[in-house]
Amino acid sequence: IRLANSARFGLARTVGSVDDAITMVGLNQVRTLCLAACMGDAFPDASDIDRDEFWKESMACAGFSHWLARSIGADAQQAWLTGFMLRLGELIIAQQEPDKLAIIEKLPHAPGGRWEREVDQTGFTEGHVVGELVRRWNFPQEVVRALQFSSDPLASKPFSRLGGIVHIAMLLAEIGVESTTSPQDTINALPADVLKQLQLDHEWLQNNLPDVNTFTDTAA
C-alpha cells in the first residue's frame, strides 16, 4: 500500500486496500518486494552502517536499475532485484569481519569509493560476496555475473549488460542519496565507457534522470 501511494505512481487518490495496491503495483513487483524483505530480515543490522542510508541506497540502486533496464530493453524486474541485493554483500562482510567495517564506511562516501575500500580491507567487493551467495542459491548465471562484476563490468568477458546497469545504478544511488548535484553534474560523474557499452546517451540521461526520492520514499 505504501509503494502504491508513493510519488513513483503519482495517483490522484489514496490507495487504501491491499487488493487495489497489488493492482496498481503489479504482481511482479509485489513478489520482488516480498523476496527483498525476506533477504533483508535474514541479515542483522551492523552498528557501523547507517541503517537509513543503507536501505535508501539499496532501494535507489534497485529503482535506478529498473529504470535503466527498461530504458534499454533489458529485464527490468531482474535488474530491480539484482540492484537491491548488491549492498547485502556488505552486511555479510560485517558479519564475518566486523573490525573492517568502520574503515569501509569511512567518510566521505565518494561514489565507488566503498568498493575500493572493501577490496583494500578484504580482497573482495560486496558484489563479489553476494554474487557467491546467490550462486550457491542457484540464481540465474546472468545475475551471478552481474553482481560479481558490478564494481567493474568492463572486466567481464563478454560484457555483462546487467552488471553495467547495476554499476551505473549504484553510482546514481550514492550520488543521489549522499549529495545534491544537478542532473548534468550527476551524469558527468558516470564512467563514459560503461555508458557507451549500454548505449546510453548523456543528453537523454540528463533529460530523463528520475529524482532519487521516487525510489527512496518507500525505503524506511
Language model regions located:
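Terminal helices and disordered tails flanking the catalytic cores of nucleotide-processing hydrolases
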Residues: 192-220
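Conserved alpha-helical "signature site"
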Residues: 1-100, 105, 109, 113-188
